[in-house]
């Protein structure tokens, strides 16, 4: 029981690593079309990502001209164990690359 709390929730780790890798995060509650949060603050993003049972996270970058490049999304389910929070993600996006790094 004690050991389990040491494992950082994979959803949180995904957001943390994405921010570290230069991504901006969009957090959506379950079926909302408007993001609950957009930015690079880990604690704010995680607060919104955990405000309901399921949430979606999108990763994007902006260049100097404010052009946005999308880098896919991930779907979080918070009832799952910490290693299983990231329930799904877009193929070829940041979350897939991230997930492959976790397995390595």
Regions found by a protein language model. Give the residues of each.
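Negatively charged, low-complexity tracts enriched in Asp/Glu with abundant Ser/Thr
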Residues: 2-45
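Acidic, low-complexity, intrinsically disordered interaction modules
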Residues: 28-104
């Amino acid at each position: 029981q004690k050991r389990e709390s040491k494992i950082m929730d994979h959803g949180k780790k995904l957001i943390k690593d994405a921010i570290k890798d230069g991504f901006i995060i969009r957090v959506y509650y379950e079926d909302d079309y408007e993001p609950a949060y957009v930015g690079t603050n880990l604690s704010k993003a995680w607060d919104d990502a955990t405000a309901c049972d399921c949430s979606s996270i999108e990763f994007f970058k902006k260049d100097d001209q404010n052009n946005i490049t999308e880098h896919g999304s991930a779907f979080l389910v918070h009832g799952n164990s910490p290693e299983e929070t990231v329930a799904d993600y877009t193929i070829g996006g940041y979350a897939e690359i991230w997930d492959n790094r976790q397995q390595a």
